[in-house]
Amino acid sequence: MGNPLILIEIHNRAGLIRFNRPQQLNALNGAVMEELAAAAESFDKDDAVGAIVITGDERAFAAGADIKEMADASSVDMLLADRISKWDRLRKVKKPVIAAVSGFCLGGGCELAMACDMIVASETAKFGQPEINLGVMPGAGGTQRLTRAVGKAIAMEVVLNGRTLSADEAYRFGLVNRVVPVEQYLNEALKLANEIAARAPLAVRLAKEAVNNAFESFLA
């Protein structure tokens, strides 16, 4: 039996979901996304959990989609995999979701981080949408969320030329909330999650919904 694709923990009132594919730099495939969505939904129903943190490891949050899975799949397989529904399930989680990012956060990994409500980054984090190098464009709302976070000019350079943003650049451009030393990034995200979890749950849920409605009103 292989290693689990994700690891799940609870830290006080923060639910932690950790990707567990270090040899693949936590590349996202259909199985990982299914387990991620299921874990997030489980935490969303758990009254003991007030906020959720998603993370990888120090080398990589997630270095993109699993290219091997994509290369091995036929167009029919890709259609049946129904990846969009897994992203949609995560988007529908009512509790705040924080991405704790260190190392590579590229392609699908960057899109996942941007789909979270907040991002805490280590100083080593690198954000990018390198899909153009593979002859495709970013999906999962990546182009819209990136543009709204950093503005059109920077988004064009990232998307059209594969530019990678350092953690400090991502902070300056408004993509991330906080940048901390690598040894502190996960604890900082858990601390933030527990601070939010201490607030009135209904108010937090409604406030998240209101902000997302304002932000995503034109997202497909």
Regions found by a protein language model. Give the residues of each.
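Short, intrinsically disordered, charge-balanced linker/junction segments flanking boundaries
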Residues: 177, 215-220
